[in-house]
Each structure stands twice: as C-alpha cells, then as structure tokens.
C-alpha cells in the first residue's frame, strides 16, 4: 500500500509540474520521500522541481543524492546537468549531460539540455544540432520548438521564429516560453502593444514568471524613450557583473574628469560646464531610473488578473 501511495504521489507531482504548481509538486515529492527516502527517481524529480522554484542549492543537493543512489539512472545525471547550468558550471553540466546520453542515447530531454548548454556557451550551430535532434526524438515538444525559435530570432530569422512559436502555441496555447518568444518577435516588428499583451497573458498564469516580467519590461522600455535608455543601460551593466560594472563606472568618471580638465585648460569653460552638468544628469538619471521604472511597472502589474487556479 505504501509503494502504491508513493507512485500516486509521484504521478501527482508530475501533473502539478505540468500545470505550473511547483510548490505543490515539491510538497508531494517530500511526502513520497518520507516513505521511500532512498528512491533516486524521486530525488531527481524533486531536484527539477526545486530548480523550477529557483532554489538551486537545494536542487543541487537532491540531484547529487540521486546520482549517488543510482549512478546508472539517466534522469539523475540529466537533472544534475540542468542544476550545474544554473550555477554556470558549463563544464560540469557537459559532463553530466554526456553521462546521461551514454546511458540513454535517445533521451530527448538530455539532448535538449545539451543544446541549451551549447547556447549558453555561445555555440549556436552546436546548439541547433542538439535541439533539432531532441525534436526528432520527440516531435512537437514545445520546449524544443521554443529553443529553436530563440536561436532563429537571435540569428535574425524572424519568420522562422514566428513559425516555431505558432507551432508550439497550437498544441500548448498557454506555454510560457512560446508566448514569450512570440512577444519577442512582435517587439522586433515594432508591435509593442501586442507584445505587452503576450506578457500579460504569461503573468496571468504566473505572476512570478521571469519570462513574463522580462517581456513586459522590454515592452515598457520601447514605449518610453527615457525608460528605454535606462533599461538598456541597466541591462548592459548587469551583463558585465559587479566587478566589471564598477570598473566601467570608475572609467567613465575618470574620463569625464579628464575631459573637463582638458576643456578648462583649452579655455573652453562653457563646454567644461556642460560636460560637468551632463555627468550630474547621468548620475541622477541612473539613480532615480530604477524607482521610476519600478513604479511604472507596478501600475502595469496592478491591472493583471490572475487565473483562478493560480
């Protein structure tokens, strides 16, 4: 009876994950593990659920536990690969996905993970080959379609990206990744309001969705020149990391001081004053920009009505 109950809890967790109820799935899996604490498949699935909940440290513990319990289990290595990707350990992730494919060469999810790894490492050709192989093994998989669409859009193939998004949405109308991809296509075409509607559609399903918030922010940035400039500057600085962004700011400040000094030495005091004012304006703008953007976004999110089953 206990084993049957565990299997029911596992199946229920799968259904919960499929509809986006990540916390519910975590609770179901913890109940199952309280009865079968050494079941590697449950640990692997719990790791995937914890990763979806952005609890990567807990996910790593569960994934490593699954591999330790069953080194021959492909899904344990596959899940460990995704967890390592969350830590930006691309070499470790490649090793885990490689081991998963050694054990199960026809596992579409492992091929998809390998494709995402190549994409993260900026190897688009290798990423496309791996994801297309995953799609060959599991035709119509919306995640693979969206990943291929992302590669198409990044390469400037807008129509191909649109076709991928529409194919995924045809079978899965509420698929978050497909909605975000379609929104990105619309943004690239300058159809900002329609892109915003796709972002709202995502947020109705999950108000914490990073994809939905990312798309909504991008749409807001397109609708306001000042907010758009701040958004692009912030995105650029965030991509550098803390250390490099500090170096950039220090470099800009030093360059500004040198320029002002040079202008004064050349007798161009008016130009030096303008340069000083421009720096002050830049400093104030980057200081108040986050608050203005957050307030604008909060007004947008206030209009979102969540689904009843969220």
Model-derived regions, located:
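Alpha-helical linker/edge segments of TPR/alpha-solenoid repeat scaffolds
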Residues: 218-244
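Alpha-helical segment of the N-proximal tetratricopeptide repeat
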Residues: 2-41, 45-52, 82, 86
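Register position in tetratricopeptide repeats
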Residues: 18, 52-53, 86-87, 120-121, ...
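Helix-start (N-cap) detector for alpha-helical repeat units in TPR-like alpha-solenoids
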Residues: 6, 40-41, 74-75, 108-109, ...
């Amino acid at each position: 009876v206990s084993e049957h109950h565990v299997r029911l809890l596992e199946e229920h967790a799968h259904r919960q994950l499929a509809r986006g109820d990540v916390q519910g799935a975590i609770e179901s899996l913890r109940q199952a593990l309280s009865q079968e604490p050494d079941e590697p498949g449950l640990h692997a699935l719990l790791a995937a659920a914890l990763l979806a909940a952005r609890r990567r440290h807990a996910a790593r513990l569960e994934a490593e536990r699954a591999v330790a319990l069953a080194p021959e289990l492909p899904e344990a290595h596959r899940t460990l690969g995704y967890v390592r990707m969350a830590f930006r350990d691309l070499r470790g992730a490649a090793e885990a996905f490689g081991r998963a494919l050694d054990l199960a060469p026809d596992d579409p999810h492992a091929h998809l993970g390998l494709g995402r790894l190549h994409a993260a490492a900026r190897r688009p050709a290798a990423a496309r080959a791996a994801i297309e192989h995953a799609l060959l093994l599991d035709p119509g998989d919306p995640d693979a379609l969206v990943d291929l669409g992302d590669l198409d859009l990044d390469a400037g193939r807008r129509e191909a990206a649109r076709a991928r998004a529409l194919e995924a949405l045809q079978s899965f109308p509420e698929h978050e990744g497909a909605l975000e991809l379609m929104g990105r296509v619309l943004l690239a075409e300058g159809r900002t309001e329609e892109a915003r509607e796709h972002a709202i559609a995502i947020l109705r399903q999950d108000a914490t969705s990073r994809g939905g918030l990312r798309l909504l922010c991008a749409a807001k940035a397109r609708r306001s020149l000042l907010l758009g400039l701040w958004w692009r500057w912030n995105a650029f600085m965030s991509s550098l990391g803390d250390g490099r962004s500090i170096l950039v700011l220090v470099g800009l400040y030093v360059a500004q001081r040198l320029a002002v000094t040079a202008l004064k030495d050349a007798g161009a005091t008016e130009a030096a004053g303008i340069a000083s004012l421009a720096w002050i304006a830049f400093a104030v703008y980057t200081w108040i920009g986050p608050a203005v953007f957050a307030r604008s976004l909060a007004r947008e999110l206030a209009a979102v009505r969540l689904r009843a089953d969220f």
